[in-house]
Amino acid sequence: MIRNQVEMFAYAKINLALAITGRRPDGYHELESVMQSIGIYDRIRVTLAEGGIQCSCGEWSGPENLAYRAAEAFLSGLGSSQGIHIDIEKNIPVQAGLGGGSADAAAALQALNKLFKEPYTEEELKSFAAQLGADVAFCLKGGTQWATGVGEELKGLPHAPKINLVLIKPDQGVNTAEAYRAFDQEGKFSHLDYAGWQEALASGRAESLIPLLYNDLEPASMKLLPEIAWVKEELMKQNGCLGALMSGSGSAVFGIVQTEEQAEKIAAIWRERNYHVWVTHTMERGNIYG
């Protein structure tokens, strides 16, 4: 029997640290980031079908979806007109800084490569990923990675210990391009401490990471959406929360929490405040087959 469908779990990411190191002549920002897979995922089903590419993802359906564009690039490279249906069950919030669209695109590439019996090498898939968006390369790899360039150049780091996380997202999101524009007005370029991150991660203790949490986009996004600053400040007051940071360009804020029980208690407080809340943890790897 010929396999005609592959299912993937596409995992979200957080940025444990993000420094903007410069701006290229083409306008893209260069960065250094410690990127980390977490246990929130979208479920992706990719099916060989008739009638071109179709992408079903609620209000995010159609050609603008990054998974659709991933399928377009994949088929174009093969010179194939095979019909593809992509169904995405969305759990990762959008405009949150959690890389949901990038995770879906990476999962689509991986599923298609399996369906077509691996016509592309890992390096060739990375090349597609770089064309699609800065976070897609990380989502292909997953785990704990040091990202440079515009986010597409990856270097492995020691796996993060299993860290209990609470994620809180305001109703309003932050547009990534707007966050970078706001940074350009007032932000200053900086660098992360690679050796410090290696040492902290190798220690296996969540507490070791707290002094290194950092995000150059945080002040810019907080200016666009001041509620982010309030969420972070309130989260830091909760019993068991060791540290908190906005992920990516926001608007989601994550808290590193000592125990899962404490994380659930913190989540209950924020649910009573009518916030979008998730209790999750770090993952040693990224997307997996269903």
Swiss-Prot record:
ATP binds at P93, V94, Q95, A96, G97, L98, G99, G100, G101, S102, A103. Catalyzes the phosphorylation of the position 2 hydroxy group of 4-diphosphocytidyl-2C-methyl-D-erythritol. The keyword Kinase applies. It is an enzyme of class 2 (transferase). One of its GO terms (molecular function) is 4-(cytidine 5'-diphospho)-2-C-methyl-D-erythritol kinase activity. It comes from the Bacteria. The active site is at K13, D135. This is 4-diphosphocytidyl-2-C-methyl-D-erythritol kinase. Belongs to the GHMP kinase family. IspE subfamily. Pathway: Isoprenoid biosynthesis; isopentenyl diphosphate biosynthesis via DXP pathway; isopentenyl diphosphate from 1-deoxy-D-xylulose 5-phosphate: step 3/6. NCBIfam families: ispE, PRK14608.1. Keywords: ATP-binding, Isoprene biosynthesis, Kinase, Nucleotide-binding, Transferase. Its EC number is 2.7.1.148. It catalyses: 4-CDP-2-C-methyl-D-erythritol + ATP = 4-CDP-2-C-methyl-D-erythritol 2-phosphate + ADP + H(+). One of its GO terms (biological process) is isopentenyl diphosphate biosynthetic process, methylerythritol 4-phosphate pathway. It comes from Desulfitobacterium hafniense (strain Y51).
